[in-house]
């Protein structure tokens, strides 16, 4: 009898545990990624590595460049030069997912810290006559706070011309990159998202994004400098191919996308 009771108790425990795992808790998906960004030395090392490589490439370019066209570097802002992990952590602790209202509160605080190595690299670029453009998909009404945050962290050339926010609902950065390219030779692009580099990756499904990465192999580390980001990105949107899915539906797509053996 005791043995049967123990077996029943174990079954109830396992069913309860499975239910907890299966329950949709979207904010908890970000726990590991956010902790990694905030606590791991490996994350910091990868950031330093990216900006060290960017500096080496820029040094090479400056030594060999003979064009009269002024040089420029284009960078993304979020998770490329500014660390927004406190916003993600707050969402997790409050059991929330990303929402524009809470994001606006965070942006207006202008308290994001600089990514490791970012300030040093961009000041090096500016000191050598290179123009630094910050192309971000933050909204126009977030521009003032964004500029304040960048200035407080010590980034150079932070003004209305160099900080280019999203206009309207268009998230594609290619028109803004082309605007810079009309006057400058863009020698480096820095970002955490493939859309920060080329229109090849904008709103493409997973297979096409990955195929285009392979086609662009020569640019990574030479013209494209990629920062790590394990908390969010357009790679997720690519999984559900632009469909408007509920949290539960996104869960199903994620589980179905895992490759085991």
Regions found by a protein language model. Name each.
Residues 24, 41, 139, 143-261:
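C-terminal cap/substrate-recognition subdomain and adjoining C-terminal extension
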Residues 47-50, 54-57, 114-121, 142, ...:
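Stable alpha-helical elements in mature extracytoplasmic
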Residues 88-114:
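Metal-dependent phosphoesterase signature
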Residues 1-23:
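Bacterial Sec-dependent N-terminal signal peptides
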Residues 17-75, 240-261:
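Non-catalytic pre-domain segments flanking phosphatase-related domains
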Residues 105-133, 140:
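Short, acidic loop-to-helix structural element flanking the phosphoryl-transfer center
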Residues 72-84:
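Asp-based phosphoryl-transfer active-site loop
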